[in-house]
Amino acid sequence: MSEEKKYELWLDNYFFKPNFWQKCLAFVLLPLSVLYAFFAILNTFFRKKIVFKKPVISVGNLSFGGNGKTPLCKAIAREFDGVFIVLRGYKRKSKGLFVVKNQNEILCTLAQSGDEAMEYAFEENVKGVIVSEDRVKGIKKAFELGAKIVVLDDAFSKFHIKKFDILLESKIKPYFNFILPSGSYRLPKFYERRADFIALEGRDFLRYSFVKKNLKAVLVTAIAKPFRLYEHFIKARACYFFKDHYEFKKEELENLLKKHNCDTLMLTFKDFVKVKDFGFKCQIIELNIELKDSLREKIKTYIKEFEQ
């Protein structure tokens, strides 16, 4: 196991299943967490509120890492017409605003968009995708291009934007309710009161995934919290976990297949968009979310406010 992978595993345990020494470290780092909290809270004030004349929905979470934001955004796009996704485009090799997709046409490369944005671009029900560090510019561009609804991926902390805030709450909670670096929260937990709707897994949405068993496949993934795929680990001959947003190299994947005498890569769609041009046989792990009536009706009510 590489040093990078060991660090990822250590960090995962530190936030969710800490041992005695990791718990001690969390308390030692509390003064830094207080300082971080001060600046994080300060950053949410003193900015003019920006209001749009069309629906803007944000899907986010308080803790760092994957909680299912991408499949939930895609689920919203399947339920409502004319949805554009606006996101930062983490780990992309570009800066500024890029239109990744417009009206079912992909307009840039994976390097320019980042893996998450390109995953959205391949979703038929998502009509447009825009990456921009400045979410306000991204929203304006989306509406210029004909968006009926803008969904923001991971923008809960953008309190200067008037929007319908959906805060995801996973079944798997951090061990401590501390913020970084003592815990995994990016803002104090009391900030969840600022959400318009707290979406609880099992109550407001159902998460499910599917892939057929294939012992000629090697499971590789570079998503946050790969333990979410635990039910599929036994369906492949071997499993390898990489850092979130990791850029796969063709040679290393070839070596993994040869090592285990396999001919197929088993991966999520987010991983697939990064290897699709390598020529490997791939088997996609379908990760989906189904909205329950409680959340669906809240979104419908919000959208209807703009039809009056």
From Swiss-Prot:
Keywords: ATP-binding, Kinase, Lipid A biosynthesis, Lipid biosynthesis, Lipid metabolism, Nucleotide-binding, Transferase. ATP binds at residues 63-70. GO terms for cellular component: plasma membrane. Its EC number is 2.7.1.130. Pfam families: LpxK. GO terms for molecular function: ATP binding; tetraacyldisaccharide 4'-kinase activity. It catalyses: a lipid A disaccharide + ATP = a lipid IVA + ADP + H(+). It comes from the Bacteria. InterPro entries: LpxK. GO terms for biological process: lipid A biosynthetic process; lipopolysaccharide core region biosynthetic process. The keyword Endoplasmic reticulum does not apply. Transmembrane segments: none annotated. Belongs to the LpxK family. PANTHER family: TETRAACYLDISACCHARIDE 4'-KINASE (PTHR42724), TETRAACYLDISACCHARIDE 4'-KINASE, MITOCHONDRIAL-RELATED (PTHR42724:SF1). Transfers the gamma-phosphate of ATP to the 4'-position of a tetraacyldisaccharide 1-phosphate intermediate (termed DS-1-P) to form tetraacyldisaccharide 1,4'-bis-phosphate (lipid IVA). NCBIfam families: PRK00652.1-5. This is Tetraacyldisaccharide 4'-kinase.
